[in-house]
Amino acid sequence: MDSIVTTEDTIAAIASAISIGKGGVAIIRVSGKDSINSCKKIVQTKSKYAWESHRVFHGFILENKQNKFIDEVLILVMKSPNSFTGEDVVELHCHGGIILVNKVLQRLLSSNSRVRLANPGEFSQRAFLNGKIDLTQAESINQLINASNTRSAELAFSGVQGKIKKKINDIKNDLINQLCEIEARVDFEEDFTDFDYNKYLKNIKKVKEKIELLIENAKRNSYIHNGISIALIGKTNVGKSSLLNLLAKKEKAIVTNIPGTTRDVIEVNLTINDIPMKIIDTAGIRETHEQIESIGIKKSFRKIKESDFIIYIYSLEEGFNKEDKKIIQEIPKEKLITILGNKKDLIDCKNINSNELKNTILMSIKNNDGERLLIDTIIKKCGLKQVENINIFLNERHLTNLSSCLSNLNDTDVIIKNKLPFDLLSIELRDGIQNLSKITGQELTEELLDNIFSKFCIGK
C-alpha cells in the first residue's frame, strides 16, 4: 500500500445532496487526524460501539457544555487507512433540514481550530494523494454525481471501478515493452542492423489503433453525457416549429401559416432513447428587410456553428431548390447533417426526383409520420447505434493526452522511415508514456491537480 499523506488540518463538509433545503437525512463528512477527537467533543453517546472503526452508533450533538442537544444522530467511524480518503473519517448522519445540518457543521468547526471547511473536491483529492484512487476514478466519481441520464451514470461508474485506468495502463505497458528494447540497444551501443523494423511498426500500429478507438469513443460518449445539440434549419414555413413541438410532445413554439413567425431561437431539452438532446428551433432563413427578423436569421446561422447536428428541413411541395442549396452550402462540411423533406402527405412521393430522395428523410410532421426514422437517423449518424459497446467515459483532458500520445507514436514512424537516430525514438516513446501517465495522474503538477479537483462539489 502507498504511504498515507497526512495534513495538519482536518476538513469537514456536508456530503449529502440537500439542494431543496430539506430531506430525511443529511451527512456531514469529517476527514483528518483530528476528526475523531473533534467529533468526540460535540457528541454524547452511551453506545458500547462508540468510536470503533466501521461501526455505526447512536448519539446526540451537544450545543454546549450544559448538555443542551442540537440533534439526534448516527455516527459512522472509519479509521485510517481503511476509509475513502485513507485518513480517519467520521460521518455524522443528521436530520436533513439545511438550517439544522448547518448548525451541526458550525458546532463542529468551532470545536477545534484545526478543523476547517473542506474545499471543493478536497476529500477526493486526499483519496488520490493517499493512493486510494487514481485520477480517472476521482474524475469518474464527479462524473457519476453529475450524470444527466442512466447511460451516463453507467459509463461514469465503470470509471469509478477502474476500467479507464486498466485500459490506459494496458496501452502504457505495450509502449514500455517497446521502449525497453530500444533503450537496451541505445544504452549498450548495440548495432541496430538486426533490429526488426517491421515488427516494431506492426506493434506500434496496434497501439495506435487502440488509442484511435478510445478517441473515437470519447467523442461519442460526450454526446451521452453532455447531450446532442440539434439545430432545426430551413426556410420559412417548412415545419421547423412543428417538428420542435412534435419532439417535445407539447406546444413549445407558435405555429402559423405566416412566414417569419419564429423570430428568435427556442431551445427545448429532451431525453430520447436515454440520450439528452437539445432541440433548437431557429428563424426561417430568407431575404428580408425586417430588422427583428434579420436578427433572428443571424442567430440561426450562429446556431448552425454551435450545434452538434443539423436537421435541414424543406417543403416537398416546393421541392429542394436553389435557395435550399445555397443555405446548405453555408453549413460547415464537418457538421453532421440530415435533410428532411416535410409535407409528404400533400404530394405523391412517386413523382419526386430520385436525386432529391437521396439521403433525404421523407416526413409528414403534421401527421407524425416519420418521427421514429428521424430519431434513428440522428442516433446512427452520431455513432450511438451501438451505444452499449461504449463502456467507459473519457473527458476532454483524457482526449487531449491520448491525442498527444498518438502524435508521439506518429513521430516514431517518421523517425524509423527516415532512419533518424534511435535516441530520438526513445524520446518520443518516453513522451508518449508520460502523456498516458498524465491521464491517471502520475505526471501532473500540483497546480493542475488543484484545478481539476476545484470543479468537484464541496462534500466530495
Curated annotation (Swiss-Prot):
Exhibits a very high intrinsic GTPase hydrolysis rate. Involved in the addition of a carboxymethylaminomethyl (cmnm) group at the wobble position (U34) of certain tRNAs, forming tRNA-cmnm(5)s(2)U34. It is an enzyme of class 3 (hydrolase). Keywords: Cytoplasm, GTP-binding, Hydrolase, Magnesium, Metal-binding, Nucleotide-binding, Potassium, tRNA processing. Homodimer. Heterotetramer of two MnmE and two MnmG subunits. Mg(2+) binds at residues 241, 262. Its EC number is 3.6.-.-. GO terms for biological process: tRNA methylation; tRNA wobble uridine modification. InterPro entries: G_TrmE, GTP-bd, GTP-bd_TrmE_N, GTPase_MnmE, MnmE_dom2, MnmE_helical, P-loop_NTPase, Small_GTP-bd. Residues 227-383 form the TrmE-type G domain. GO terms for molecular function: GTP binding; GTPase activity; metal ion binding. This is tRNA modification GTPase MnmE. It is found in: Cytoplasm. (6S)-5-formyl-5,6,7,8-tetrahydrofolate binds at residues 29, 91, 132, 460. Pfam families: MMR_HSR1, MnmE_helical, TrmE_N. Its cofactor is K(+). Binds 1 potassium ion per subunit. Belongs to the TRAFAC class TrmE-Era-EngA-EngB-Septin-like GTPase superfamily. TrmE GTPase family. K(+) binds at residues 237, 256, 258, 261. The keyword Transferase does not apply. Disulfide bonds: none annotated. GO terms for cellular component: cytosol. GTP binds at residues 237-242, 256-262, 281-284.
